[in-house]
Amino acid sequence: SQKITKRIAIFDIENGLNQLENFPYHDYPLNQVRGAHHNVISFMSDQHPVRNYSEAKDFIKRTDLVKDVFTGQLDWLRKQAAMGIYAPEFVYDHIINQLNELINYSADEHPLYTEFFKKVELLNISESKFSSLDNNLRASIETSVTPGFVLLRDYMVSTKAKANKNHGIWSQPNGDEFYKLRIRSYTTTNFSPEEIHNIGLSEVARISARMMEILTSLGYDSTKTAGVLMNELNEDPSLLYADTLN
């Protein structure tokens, strides 16, 4: 098992190095499911420990750096833009909406504030220390966190006209080669995109045919497709549990 683990590790590292060396700016560091704007909130809210007063102060020291973090992210995005790489239009729409939501939070509503004080309220600290944390985090959100999100939002708005009209990575500079690398990473094969596509079509046809054999043998309508029949099965009351508490 150690030999297999080693081979997997080497495979992953080689693919990662290939991407870093040949496609360093083909990723989308801001998108609708992940990115710096998500990571800051999730790390600070869910992972950063606040088990004592010292850690609470450390939390605020880090929120003071959010604007710097996003400034660094902007430098990366500008280098990506210099290569002619922009995220697809639908990504822009989601990101701008998400950033506007984060910008429009008041301090009392901000997830960094609310999650932080859920933890602080469990600490045995004096009222003066509690008040100090409250004032400092409010100031940090106002001077670092929100301005950082504004930086990202303004960049996305200013470059939206250049957003990629296509969704596929193939449409980016040297995108076909990057796509081949991602296929290799995901499938662990050296198949071409065309071969992978044809395998997919073949497997869908094979599985659908076998499903139809089973469904028609059970008396289901053979004139309908496997997909239609599966949807009907999912909605058949006789095959569903009742909506009860038990």
What residues fall within each predicted segment?
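N-terminal maturation segment of proteins
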Residues: 1-246
